[in-house]
Regions:
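Substrate-binding groove of N-acetylhexosamine-processing glycoside hydrolases
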Residues: 2, 136, 142, 189-196, ...
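Auxiliary, metal-adjacent structural segments of Zn-dependent hydrolase domains
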Residues: 17-27
């Protein structure tokens, strides 16, 4: 694969109009671009870093900017001459080893552009659901590999390793016992917070999981990271053996939305310890990946991250008005403590941060501005032993959150905060960069004005903001777009702010008890009828607003997604987040 990566680097060098010598130097921490007697040299410790260097040269001197997948920007006025001699871009060790995305949707026609963009921005990792990896073609697997992108086949997957369609009838004892009865697995048909787990203390179940893992990796020899993650939600087994791992007096925590359930860290980590040892005995080349999430956020007593183990700590519903280590925040310092607990038990294993730099799926393209905070957090992660960062994303909403993704990539490689932000604004907006900065400052101020803390779900934003703020943003976006009517990104900002105005109006009408189903239908029709854009994901609105429709019909108060336990936390957020 290294030969193919070198060949791709040479092809991309020519494609972007650059001339340079490519040389491998094992002692470098990353690529370095130099000039020697008028000749450009890209040196790097490996072919993937050489490829990164080719793209860095195209951006630095070739007039290119790689902001979004499939849409290279080229401005000949930004081409520059290089000095006769000296280092142009010095080698710099990336702050984090693993940098990438969590893909929660099938691979599709956008995937080649995504892999291309990731390489252009120095990202090297994708975590995806096993069911989506199963649909990834060999050609796309190679396209990822040649660009240095590792794909983890995993995510929530108890029901993949032990599917109900295979085991419900023959091994009902493999599934959780709830209320004295074994559940019948729905096989993930209800994918939202499935809350169907396994009887994880069953030794035959553990052996079967390992057998299935080994078989899977034999059928997919390219897979080197395989996951064992609970199904989303709760529903842990209550049989006699499993119940030994619960302390009925020890529930979860408010910050991680788990005060209403027992902690599952001990029972989950006992399973992981056993499966990792069995897997290591047969396939020591494999890494076992797993989640820290909701009611199993921190390592249980005595649990260690051994070599070949990798945890991804999900910062679910973190506050986006503060950095993760800000002691003044109500939520985030608890996650910071969890991070430190995980890095303190590393014994050859690795720690990743699972982020939501698009809020969460049902934040519905509402604003999250995490620019300067991104650089500060990546430095904090690096300083405290974190190995990787990944975020959920969608290409379809790139014009809303793409700047977060762009800054995450640069920050995780150790780029300078001020230089990076200035470069992105100048490349995206040219002479209008200062006006664009004012627009994004206004968006950021909208978030800060919501209160001391802000958790990314619609109610938290819309009930604590004013319509005039959204109308002002819309006017600012229109002014920016009027200066470059040919720029689809600026057009998307107009659409984005119009959408926010409409959503705010819908929310206010509901609060005033004036909203009807016809109004909701009109809003959804507007969402679906927009021309091609990278702002809105219509299917997310269809899913989210089923709850609102049900509540309009029943008279129940609409809070979020009609999950009683979740609505309860949101009502408490109303009171405690400031």
């Amino acid at each position: 694969m290294q030969d193919k990566t070198l060949e791709l680097a040479r092809q991309e060098l020519a494609k972007y109009g650059s001339q340079a010598e490519l040389t491998l130097e094992a002692g470098l921490p990353s690529y370095e671009i130099r000039r020697r007697d008028g000749v450009t040299v890209i040196a790097a410790p490996d072919p993937v870093e050489l490829l990164y260097g080719v793209y860095a040269l195209a951006e630095y001197a070739g007039g290119y900017f790689f902001f979004e997948p499939g849409r290279d920007r080229f401005d000949p006025a930004r081409k520059r001459e290089l000095p006769e001699d000296g280092v142009v871009i010095p080698a710099r060790k990336p702050l984090l080893k693993r940098r990438g995305f969590i893909q929660e949707f099938p691979f599709n026609s956008d995937t080649p552009g995504l892999f291309d963009w990731m390489a252009k921005n120095g990202l090297n990792f994708i975590q995806t659901w096993m069911k989506y990896y199963d649909g990834l073609s060999d050609e796309l697997k190679e396209a990822a590999a040649v660009r240095g992108i590792t794909i983890e086949s995993g995510h929530h997957n108890f029901n993949y390793w032990i599917p109900g369609r295979k085991y419900n009838a023959t091994h009902p004892e493999f599934f959780a016992e709830i209320g004295g009865k074994r559940i019948k697995s729905s096989d993930g048909k209800n994918t939202l917070l499935l809350s169907e787990q396994l009887c994880t203390t069953n030794p035959e179940l553990r052996a079967e999981i390992v057998r299935n893992m080994i078989d899977y990796c034999e059928r997919h020899p390219e897979v080197k990271i395989v996951a064992l993650n609970p199904n989303d939600g709760f529903g842990w087994c209550e049989c006699r053996e499993c119940s030994k791992f619960y302390d009925k007096n020890k529930k979860g925590d408010f910050y991680s939305l788990s005060e209403h359930v027992y902690k599952a860290d001990r029972i989950y980590h006992d399973l992981l310890r056993d499966v990792a040892a069995r897997l290591r005995a047969v396939r020591p080349d494999l890494t076992l990946s797993f989640f820290a999430y909701i009611n199993y956020c921190a390592p249980s007593p005595g649990f260690t991250l051994e070599k070949g183990m990798m945890v991804s700590l999900a910062l679910y519903w973190r506050c986006i008005n503060h950095t993760i280590d800000d002691p003044s925040c109500v939520i985030n310092p608890h996650y910071a403590e969890d991070i430190l607990r995980w890095t303190s038990v590393k014994h050859g294993g690795e720690v990743n941060i699972y982020e939501y730099f698009m809020g969460v799926n049902f934040y519905l393209m509402l604003p999250m501005i995490h620019f300067r905070e991104m650089f500060r957090e990546m430095r904090w992660y690096s300083d405290h032993g974190v190995d990787g960062i990944m975020t959920q994303f969608h290409i379809q909403h790139w014009s809303v959150y793409g700047m977060n993704y762009c800054f995450m990539a640069r920050a995780a490689r150790g780029a300078d905060e001020t230089d990076s932000i200035e470069l992105v604004f100048r490349r995206l907006f040219g002479a209008d960069a200062d006006e664009a900065k004012a627009f994004y400052r206004a968006v950021k101020q909208l978030l800060m004005n919501t209160g001391h803390c802000h958790i990314p779900y619609p109610r938290a934003l819309l009930r604590r903001s004013k319509m005039e703020d959204y109308r002002r943003l819309h006017a600012m976006a229109q002014a920016l777009a009027s200066k470059r009517p040919d720029d689809p990104f600026r057009a998307d900002l107009v659409l984005w702010t119009e959408y926010m105005v409409r959503f705010k109006q819908l929310f206010d009408d509901y609060q005033a008890k004036k909203l009807t189903e016809a109004d909701l239908d009109a809003f959804l029709e507007w969402i679906h009828s927009r021309p091609a854009n990278r702002v809105l994901i219509p299917s997310k609105f269809d899913s989210y607003f089923r709850a609102l429709r049900e509540d309009l019909q029943s008279g129940r108060e609409w809070v979020h997604f009609n999950l009683d336990w979740e609505d309860g936390y949101i009502r408490r957020h109303d009171e405690v987040l400031g």
